[in-house]
Curated annotation (Swiss-Prot):
Stretch list, region Disordered: 24-57, 311-348, 377-398, 516-547
GO biological process: cellular response to chemokine; negative regulation of GTPase activity; negative regulation of T cell migration
Segments annotated as LRR repeats: 98-119, 121-143, 144-166, 167-187, 189-210, 212-234, 235-255, 257-278, 283-304
Ranges of biased composition (kind: Gly residues): 37-54
Protein name: Leucine-rich repeat and calponin homology domain-containing protein 1
UniProt keyword Repeat present: yes
Compositional bias (Basic and acidic residues): 311-322
Role of this protein: Acts as a negative regulator of GTPase CDC42 by sequestering CDC42-guanine exchange factor DOCK8. Probably by preventing CDC42 activation, negatively regulates CD4(+) T-cell migration.
GO CC annotation terms, alphabetical: cytoplasm
Residues modified as Phosphothreonine: 568
Residues with the Phosphoserine modification: 370, 409, 532, 536
Length: 728
């Protein structure tokens, strides 16, 4: 049912057609137009009368006709009659208990009339544009009410009793609501909720219980945060424009059924304004990218024991007859296509290596987490049993006794190195690893936030995604002992047939030896000696077809000490400290020159090129004619504008005389290569310090020359004047 002059109510016409009898609807429609026109009918005269006085007779005529029509049709229309209360005088003469629709909009009611609360068949109630401040609890009697319009009133709160109605549409816009009741979650059938133009500061969490809600309008309120519970709703339209929302939660990307999203006039920071202006698709794409970045960052900090077990990958490898060594998925792996006598068992050996490697890594990670040094021996007690149980008879056990002793000694050496690694990893005891951002707040393991951030950055550096990935076991070793790809894995040219030999950590070699011993029943002692790194290098030449054994875990004994993971970690930490000092020096240089305080994140301050352009303009004015600067509406420049600023800065540096050797590239600035940026800035500042004296000297020379020419001209004029005077 459309109301005269009211706001658009999309739900009313549908209910009007469904609830009113078709024979009564045209008559009601005609009556509606009479009121809208305001002429010709007694109802129109009544609409212009007051509640008392000389207009009682026209008012009573209009009310009588409206009430009589309501009793016959079930639709009560008392709109725009300036009523301050329900007309009680005429009501007893008519039976309105079966009223289905009631329109009391555009009146002067200060509360919902109690008479309406007795219309138990009422389905649609329109109280638009009144002065209502109170809603009686008796409204809970309207258990057939599905549409309620309370817009443009003076309500300061919605009563909890209102949430006990079977409402499908609730419109309470243009009121003074400060909040929504927590009982709003009881409106299970609510499909449309409009609380726009109010004073709501926060939405209750119970709003996520409105499973039938399809349209939510919270426009022009004081919302700062959008509750994540909105994701649980199947919203089709969501309007939160003209609020104070700063961030759209990342989880909103899961609102798959959302078709209309209105968010203008919000000080949004995430997503940025240039993304929001492009529409819902770009906003959701931005949120998805942010979610992927968060998931990727979180996966880097997972503990070794929390990561997926290796046997899951091993099972996948068995299905396609690939041990993980010979796979070529684009990374630098060893090729396993060369023919050899081992081909019949080439699949079993790497599988056993991987399974044994997983067990050793788990036990070693448990040891590194344990504060008690004595637990190290308990963790590795099962290993000698592997050597003993692998032989099926006493003779085979005797054959491998000497070799087992050698392996045990190597294993003890490995254990000692692991203990040294544990000692080195205690950053608070190593003065070389302490940087300005890594400090201990107390001796009771209360670590400073800066230390945690530095450690996370260290993990990012050490777990380089561009590194070599040889197989599943080697990735687990890199997780156990984080090393950079360039230092942890070395590809050396082997003197034997030009083959490539892969350098791995000492863990790989020990595990290879243990695995070969545990599977000794499948090999002869000679085969084991050929695959053992303890044998002389000449034994490698006895491999079939002159090729090296395909085990990726083998390497010469001479390189055991050449790759030290502790040294690699130390070097990474030193590089981090040097880079931090470099950034601070660069910050001081720019701040001293510009006399401003830069943002805490220097990389973000330099990447857009604005600061650099101001720096070169400070050294020589108007070197960069136009600079793209962020605005409050667009707080971040696009990549094209950032690159244009950077290119203008570099071009100005060339004009000032910065050598090409000292000039960084645009990619260095956009990718925050502080070493090259520092070199360019230092050269620029040095030229700036040398430039003023020649400039001032040049200006003085020009001034002196101008004065001399002026004096000479005056002298010539004087001589000419006197010469003419004498000759005359």
């Amino acid at each position: 049912m459309a109301t005269p002059g009211s706001e658009p109510q999309p739900f009313v016409p549908a209910l009007s057609v469904a609830t009113l009898h078709p024979l009564h609807h045209p008559h009601h429609h005609h009556h509606h137009h009479q009121h809208h026109g305001g002429t010709g009918a007694p109802g129109g005269a009544g609409g212009g009368g007051g509640g008392s006085g000389g207009f009682n007779l026209p008012l009573n005529r209009g009310l009588e006709r409206a009430l009589e029509e309501a009793a016959n049709s079930g639709g009560l229309n008392l709109s725009a009659r300036k009523l301050k209360e329900f007309p009680r005088t005429a009501a007893p003469g008519h039976d309105l208990s079966d009223t289905v629709q009631a329109d009391l909009s555009k009146n002067r009611l200060v509360e919902v009339p109690m008479e309406l609360c007795h219309f138990v068949s009422l389905e649609i109630l329109n109280l638009y544009h009144n002065c209502i401040r109170v809603i009686p609890e008796a409204i809970v009697n309207l258990q057939m009410l599905t549409y309620l319009n309370l817009s443009r009133n003076q309500l300061s709160a919605l009563p909890a009793c209102l949430c006990g109605l079977p409402l499908k549409v609730l419109i309470a816009s243009n009121n003074k609501l400060g909040s929504l009741p927590e009982e709003i979650g009881q409106l299970k059938q609510l499909m449309e909720l409009d609380v726009s133009c109010n004073e709501i500061t926060a939405l209750p969490q119970q709003i996520g219980q409105l499973k039938s809600l399809r349209e939510l309008n919270v426009r022009r309120n004081y919302l700062k945060v959008l509750p994540q519970e909105l994701v649980d709703l199947s919203l089709v339209k969501f309007d939160f424009s003209c609020n104070k929302v700063l961030v759209i939660p990342i989880c909103f990307r899961e609102m798959k059924q959302l078709q209309v999203l209105l968010l203008e006039n919000n000080p949004l920071q995430s997503p940025p304004a240039q993304i929001c202006t492009k529409g819902k698709v770009h906003i959701f794409k931005y949120l998805s990218i942010q979610a992927c970045q968060i998931k990727t960052a979180d996966s880097l900090y997972l503990h070794t024991m929390e990561r997926p077990h290796l046997h899951q990958h091993v099972e996948d490898g068995k299905k396609d007859s690939d041990s993980g060594v010979g796979s070529d998925n684009g990374d630098k792996r060893l090729s396993a296509t060369e023919p050899s006598d081992e081909d019949t068992v080439s699949l079993n050996v790497p599988m056993s290596n991987i399974m044994e490697e997983e067990q050793i890594i788990k036990e070693d990670s448990c040891h590194r987490l344990s504060p008690v040094k004595g637990e190290f021996h308990q963790e590795f007690q099962p290993e000698p049993s592997l050597l003993g149980d692998s032989t099926n008879s006493g003779e085979e056990r005797d054959q491998f006794t000497d070799r087992a002793d050698g392996l045990h000694s190597e294993f003890m050496n490995y254990k000692a190195r692991a203990e040294d690694c544990e000692e080195l990893l205690r950053i608070e005891e190593d003065v070389h690893w302490q940087t300005e951002g890594i400090i201990s707040s107390s001796k009771d393991q209360d670590m400073d936030i800066a230390m945690i951030e530095q450690l996370r950055e260290a993990v990012d550096l050490l777990q380089d995604p561009n590194g070599l990935s040889t197989d599943i076991t080697e990735r687990s070793v890199l997780n156990l002992y984080p090393m950079g790809s360039a230092e942890a894995l070395e590809l050396q040219d082997s003197a034997l047939n030009g083959q490539i030999q892969l350098e791995t950590s000492p863990v790989c070699e020990v595990q290879s030896d243990l695995t070969l011993q545990s599977n000794g029943s499948q090999y002869s002692p000679n085969e084991i000696r050929e695959n053992s790194p303890a044998v002389s290098p000449t034994t490698n030449s006895t491999a079939p077809f002159g090729l090296k054994p395909r085990s990726v875990f083998l390497r010469p004994q001479r390189n055991l000490e050449s790759i030290d993971p502790q040294f690699t970690i130390r070097r990474k930490m030193e590089q981090m400290r040097e880079e931090k000092e470099l950034v601070e020096q660069l910050r001081e240089s720019i701040e001293m020159r510009l006399k401003v305080s830069l943002h805490e994140d220097l990389g973000a301050a330099l990447m857009d090129g604005v600061v650099l352009c101001h720096l070169v303009n400070h050294i020589r004015p108007r070197s960069v004619a136009s600079i793209h600067v962020p605005s409050p509406a667009v707080p971040k420049l696009s990549m094209a504008k950032c690159r244009r600023n950077v290119e203008n800065f570099l071009e100005a540096c060339r004009k000032l005389g910065v050598p090409e050797a000292d000039l960084c590239s645009p990619c260095d600035i956009l990718q925050l290569d502080f070493r090259h940026i520092r070199k360019t800035v230092d050269t620029l500042l040095a030229l700036g310090e040398k430039a003023p004296p020649p400039t001032s000297a040049l200006r003085s020379r020009d001034l002196i020359g101008f004065c001399l020419v002026h004096i000479l001209f005056i002298v010539l004029v004087y001589i000419t004047y006197h010469w003419n005077a004498l000759s005359a």
